Amino acid sequence: MKKLNLLVLLGVFCGVSGVGDADVKVSDALLQSILVEPKIRVLLLSESTTALIEAKGAFSVFGDGELLRVSSQGQRCAAHALYGGIRWGENYPNVECLKIEPLDGAASLFVNGIQYRGAIYIHRTDRSCLFIVNELAVEDYLKSTLSVKYLKELDKEALSACVILERTALYERLLAGNSHSFWHVNAQEDRYGGFGVTSQFYGVEEAVDWTSRLVLDNPEGLVFNADYLLRANVDRLAIEGYNARQILEKFYKDADLVVIESWEDDCKGA
């Protein structure tokens, strides 16, 4: 069962109805912290015979949910599916799913030379092939995918409005997806290139941080599309003095600005 918990912003943007001195910008919002950062699982490789996986720094290994190993040093080995388990540096017999997770912020993971935030899952299929999945925070995923989409500099309020819509559309996809799958989205389809593509210097990372976990919610089920804002010359509104919320109100008058408190589904691996 998929569950999305929302917190409607009543006080954070109170009194903002037009352009004026009382405006509160998205970057000034005080958002409530949450205990668990919402995560997304991304399919990196499917039906692969092998994958080169490297852990730089301390990491832990879980097999089907059970802690199997903790290492203070890195490891660089090819992963293979065995008839009775998975091999990555050593054999893990009778394991269907192996999870590799960094132990601290200084550690990092690489798959076939590409760096990824979060954890890496290695799933073994009945045909002795591998599915490689990256689990990371939704906010980090947005930083990566939007960094290769927004390659033109926008005013920070215009970009923040677009990011809120992009995040909204992503959560709508997560809610509508197949909960019986090991992953939520496909890296190739979403042009997800891992951590290395995030530093494009067009303000995307900052806009994601400024609007952290903010989405639009409407019980009538509006279609939220950031591309529509871009075609409508959203940058012009920001230059005229509109903040991100006011920009969104011009296009989605009945939608509420809410904070994602938590995101849960039945997509489970190791």
UniProtKB/Swiss-Prot annotation:
Origin superkingdom: Bacteria
UniProt record similarity statement: Belongs to the chlamydial CPn_0389/CT_041/TC_0311 family.
Protein name as annotated: Uncharacterized protein CT_041
UniProt lineage: Bacteria, Pseudomonadati, Chlamydiota, Chlamydiia, Chlamydiales
